[in-house]
Amino acid sequence: MMSSPIPHQQTIAAVATAVAPGQGGIAVVRLSGPAAEVVGRSVVSIPGQQLWVSHRVLYGHVMDESGKERIDEVLVLLMKGPRSFTGEDVVEIHCHGGLMAVQRVLERVLAQPHVRRALPGEFSQRAVLNGRLDLTQAEAISELVAARSRRAAQLAMTGVDGGIQRRITSLRERLLDQLSELEARVDFEEDLPPLDAAELLLELQCVRRELEQLVEDAKRGDVLRQGLQVALVGRPNVGKSSLLNRLSRRERAIVTDLPGTTRDVLESEIVLEGVPITLVDTAGIRATKDALEQLGIDRSHQALAAADVAVLVFDLSLGWTADDAALLAQIPDDLPRLLVGNKADLQPASMTASLSNEVDGKTVDVMLSALTGQGEEALIEAVLKTCGASEAQGLVVALNQRQQDLAATAAIALARTQEAAAQKLPWDFWTIDLRQAISSLGEITGEEITEAVLDRIFSRFCIGK
């Protein structure tokens, strides 16, 4: 990777903070490129004896083209390259938030010569190309911005701090050491002592196992990044909406004794033990002639198909019914499910204890009361355990999907290297797949990657990052 700034013909600009009408006291317009300082000086009027010095905050006003109207009162910060996020000259204009002020400031900036609107992720892409970040750090910044829980943010910060880069670079260097041993034998075998093939293969096996473990850990980490969708299903009036309100701690669904009150799919986002969870309260599934209720039931089936786990709620006061059994049969076999008996507060403890033998031979996972909260913690624990989310809590690093795919490719290439050794093929056959493994790991950190691939990666980032 390059350590000095790559010259770019154009200076780019974008709003680097979230913008919503009436929200946010401060917004930041960011510029990066050779004309950043010139543009900053052109659009911001600095009173008094303040000097444009790198990494010093100045006070001023963004003026309109005539120089007579003040668009906004701002603070402006110049960061000369390479001591900036992108490695280029960067100017940040800190203006008032909301919508109109920041929009007018950005329009004023974009009206200057040699400035264009930044593409999604272009600031981060320039930081990578200029050696200010490696690719895993840039991706981790994007994940930090998108984090939906404290635990996901902590995991992303490990990547921002270089945790993934150090782990992958270490594995890659170990493979490079083994490749150099093999290539030396290919070219100068007669001049070197015999290669300890067993030791080399043992090292390759160790690296392969570490890569496979990283991939396995990453799958658990996906739960923290993407969250889980939990579908609450059951007959009408078994307490699904009450359970949703209990878990989300706010009144999201209308709760009455009238069957069929929920006629659509309701959602509530919560965080349980660091895992973002979307609770989906489905309309009670039953045979109905009501067209509106049937529409809600159809959407319930769609929500069930998209869920990570189904929580089938039934009424303990009525016991397990044929309708409950019919609903259970509609849950896909490959979808994890929990059987939850609600209204435990209405039943004697002896009766609820015996129900585990009454559900078609299937054990009731949790017995609770959505009204009193009895059994709530047991349900949370069961949901996290069923989805494998509990195992994600101790993760130190977690690769994203792109990184997972490349790590898996590297592990497969190492397996092929081991097969070549088992077949007693010449050294140069060993090196083919070993180079593939090294190249795949280089793609993870950005050391071996094309600009076209970078464009595709950063196009998924938000504008201004």
Curated annotation (Swiss-Prot):
Q: Report the cofactors.
A: K(+)
Q: Binding residues for (6S)-5-formyl-5,6,7,8-tetrahydrofolate, per the UniProt record?
A: R30, E92, R132, K465
Paste the cofactor note: Binds 1 potassium ion per subunit.
Any one Gene Ontology cellular component term annotated for this protein: cytosol
EC numbers, comma separated: 3.6.-.-
* Residues that bind Mg(2+): S241, T262
- One Pfam match, by short name? MMR_HSR1
Q: What is the superkingdom listed in this entry's lineage?
A: Bacteria
Write the signal peptide boundaries: none
> Where, in this chain's numbering, is GTP bound?
237-242, 256-262, 281-284, 342-345
Binding of K(+) occurs at: N237, T256, L258, T261
Against HAMAP family, the record matches this protein to: GTPase_MnmE (MF_00379)
- Quaternary structure? Homodimer. Heterotetramer of two MnmE and two MnmG subunits.
Q: What does this protein do?
A: Exhibits a very high intrinsic GTPase hydrolysis rate. Involved in the addition of a carboxymethylaminomethyl (cmnm) group at the wobble position (U34) of certain tRNAs, forming tRNA-cmnm(5)s(2)U34.
Q: Quote the protein name from its UniProt record.
A: tRNA modification GTPase MnmE
Origin organism of this chain?
Prochlorococcus marinus (strain MIT 9303)
Task: Output the lineage of the source organism.
Answer: Bacteria, Bacillati, Cyanobacteriota, Cyanophyceae, Synechococcales
User: Quick one: which gene encodes this?
Assistant: mnmE
